[in-house]
Curated annotation (Swiss-Prot):
Record carries keyword Metal-binding: yes
PANTHER family, per database record: LIM/HOMEOBOX PROTEIN LHX, LIM_HOMEOBOX PROTEIN LHX9
GO-annotated biological processes: dorsal spinal cord interneuron anterior axon guidance; negative regulation of DNA-templated transcription
Molecular function terms, GO-annotated: DNA-binding transcription factor activity, RNA polymerase II-specific; metal ion binding; RNA polymerase II transcription regulatory region sequence-specific DNA binding
DNA bind region: 249-308
SUPFAM superfamilies in the cross-refs: Glucocorticoid receptor-like (DNA-binding domain), Homeodomain-like
Positions of the UniProt region annotated as Disordered: 232-257, 310-379
UniProt biased composition (Polar residues): 326-379
Known tissue expression: Isoform 1 and isoform 3 are expressed in ovary, testis, brain and heart. Isoform 4 and isoform 5 are expressed in brain.
InterPro entries for the chain: HD, Homeobox_CS, Homeodomain-like_sf, LIM_Homeobox_TF, Znf_LIM
Main subcellular location: nucleus
Protein name per Swiss-Prot or TrEMBL: LIM/homeobox protein Lhx9
Subcellular location: Nucleus
């Protein structure tokens, strides 16, 4: 440093002032470090009070030291207790129960988010797969059946936090007879995956949103034939659901009480094919729905035809079942008010005997319907 035009006394005074300011700056100099996300300024050492290192327990005589968790550390002593990584150059460190951890080891041991497959911790910087409320490692997001890794755009199903590919999930729900297949579609957003439910429409295409109910032919339900060997107190119905054609459906069984079965059999002896108004009154009388009654009468007609053919082919075999009585013709006495009143008394009698003769002409009684007087008197 050159001084021109200044006397020696002034130069000596300037040098002393610069030295004094340099010592003052050294005393105020400190090093900062973030502890658990907070920045902490390291105060300078005071020569009056010796400071002990929290790591090795020795006296700190260095010019600079580290302050973490309200304790002083040598630069070389602040290390992760797991991997022994020196933290003097790290921006953050974490403390738990008096131990110091680096960021990776802290998240690995004490992370709140855990993989739903391997149950290990997930680092905050790690890319994950999300499905519903569960989080998975990329390597753990695989099909439970075949262990194939699922990627963005693949369809999958979930059951009890277990992931299945679409084909395997279909086989799974076929065994459980689920009413709907709830798949999940992957879409990459924000490093994770969002779950979108969809439904199959039976043609291999994907139908988004709420599935439409298909219109069933005839009565709106698939009728299961009423065989002669089945229980007469039960009727089988197919669930009216949007199943794919190849998927097996579960039958819903309806049990009839004695008075319900007695009433339907007695009316079947009068008319094999009741209309909508008759079914409504039958439903009010028996407590059954019109849909169940429709299926019962259709099954009873099918059983009647089979027994009739068996009787004709077998040469006079005895016709079984109380529902095999043919309805009387429209001009018979059964449709008069007197005959209807007699039928009503038979309905309320516990010892009902329906033993009417079988009329082989089936076309005439299926197209006809009993008169209003007969149905009113019947109930």
């Amino acid at each position: 440093m050159l001084f021109h035009g200044i006397t020696g006394g002034h130069i000596q005074g300037i040098m002393e002032e610069m030295e004094r300011r340099s010592k003052s700056a050294d005393n105020r100099l400190a090093k900062t470090i973030q502890v658990n996300g907070r920045e902490t300024r390291m105060p300078p050492l005071s020569p009056e009070k010796p400071t002990l290192c929290a790591g090795c327990g020795g006296k700190i005589s260095d010019r600079y030291y580290l302050l973490a968790v309200d304790k002083q550390w040598h630069l070389r002593c602040l290390k992760c207790c797991e991997c022994k990584l020196a933290l003097e150059s790290e921006l953050t460190c974490f403390a738990k129960d008096g131990s110091i951890y680096c960021k990776e080891d802290y998240y690995r041991r004490f992370s709140v988010q855990r993989c739903a497959r391997c149950h290990l911790g997930i680092s905050a910087s790690e890319i994950v797969m999300r499905a519903r409320e569960s989080v998975y490692h990329l390597s753990c997001f695989t099909c439970t059946t075949c262990n194939k890794t699922l990627s963005t755009g693949d369809h999958f199903g979930m059951k009890e936090n277990l992931v299945y590919r679409r084909a395997h999930f279909e086989l799974l729900v076929q065994g459980d007879f689920h009413s709907q297949l709830n798949y999940t579609e992957l879409s990459a957003k924000g490093g994770g995956l969002s779950a979108l439910p969809y439904f199959t429409n039976g043609t291999g295409a994907v139908q988004k949103g709420r599935p439409r109910k298909r219109k069933s032919p005839a009565l709106g339900v698939d009728i299961i034939n009423y065989t002669s060997g089945c229980n007469e107190n039960d009727t089988d119905l197919d669930r009216d659901q949007s199943y794919p054609p190849s998927q097996k459906t579960k039958r819903m069984r309806t049990s009839f009480k004695h008075h319900q079965l007695r009433t339907t059999k007695s009316y079947f002896a009068i008319n094999h094919n009741p209309d909508a108004k008759d079914l409504k009154q039958l439903a009010q009388k028996t407590g059954l729905t019109k849909r169940v009654l429709q299926v019962w009468f259709q099954n009873a007609r099918a059983k009647f035809r089979r027994n009739l053919l068996r009787q004709e082919n077998g040469g006079g075999d005895k016709v079984e079942g109380p529902s095999l009585s043919a309805p009387a013709s429209t001009d018979s006495a059964a449709l008069t008010p007197t005959g209807a009143a007699s039928t009503l008394s038979d309905l309320t009698s516990p010892s009902l005997n329906v033993g009417a003769s079988v009329t082989p002409n089936m076309d005439s009684h299926e197209s006809g319907s009993p008169s209003q007087t007969t149905l009113t008197n019947l109930f």
